[in-house]
Amino acid sequence: MTRIALGIQYDGAAFSGWQSQPHGNTVQDALESALRQFAGVALPTTVAGRTDAGVHALGQVVHLDTDLVREPFSWVRGTNAFLPPTVAVRWAQEMPEDFHARFSAHRRTYYYALTFGPTRAPLLEDKAGYVMLPPGQSLDVAAMNEAAQVLVGEHDFSSFRAAECQAKSPVKTMYSIEVRGEGEWVFVRIRGSAFLHHMVRNIMGCLVAIGRGRQPVSWMGDVLAARSRVAAAPTFMPDGLYLAEVGYPDAFSLPASPASSSLFRGVFDEHAGL
């Protein structure tokens, strides 16, 4: 039995999230259907991180176990032949038995892309979040970035946890959060050990409230300390959320995430010290 890791990229707008559902309209259903057509047998997959409906992925990782013998690129080419245009396998690699797409991961990076202004941009539908602001007004990016820093470190993130979250513990470690502005765009990069259900979107809801001046910078600390979902802002839209990268120990030698050459990475690399 051989363990294969696959790097997956997808546009989540048309899907009901990652996890398989009876109606079949999920990314996992699309991927496993394509694998079955290519390999001729069912090949269940294990994912690094389940994404919600409407959330995109630049660097999702899954693993599967198989008796089939194929060259790595054969998995890429063969599976992609049966996938819809909104999902693609970017790479494939044979892995040791102790590799696990979820439990071997030690870091996950999310990006959120947000626009603001008096009118929405139709060409960005489903690809970026949007905040309607009157002409001449903007989000206070500096306040958003300052407020976000209280979340860095190991904390109980119950205030940012969905009611239906199945995680055993609300305690997670946040490695870094950066908020950057570019014209009518705001980009947020969040790195952590792991994330609770809706955690990033709930953090975004609070950041937007602060950016609009509806809450002070200090409010983020109050929300965190409350350890109650009702203390935080409403869950923000999924449209601009991207699972950018899943980090593993160097010993596994997995390919670099395509996010490394993306617009998002470029925005943050322009700022010294990031």
Curated annotation (Swiss-Prot):
It holds the Pfam family PseudoU_synth_1. Keywords: Isomerase, tRNA processing. GO terms for molecular function: RNA binding; tRNA pseudouridine(38-40) synthase activity. It comes from the Bacteria. It catalyses: uridine(38/39/40) in tRNA = pseudouridine(38/39/40) in tRNA. The active site is at D52. Substrate binds at Y110. One of its GO terms (biological process) is tRNA pseudouridine synthesis. Transmembrane segments: none annotated. Its EC number is 5.4.99.12. Formation of pseudouridine at positions 38, 39 and 40 in the anticodon stem and loop of transfer RNAs. Belongs to the tRNA pseudouridine synthase TruA family. Homodimer. This is tRNA pseudouridine synthase A. It comes from Ralstonia pickettii (strain 12J).
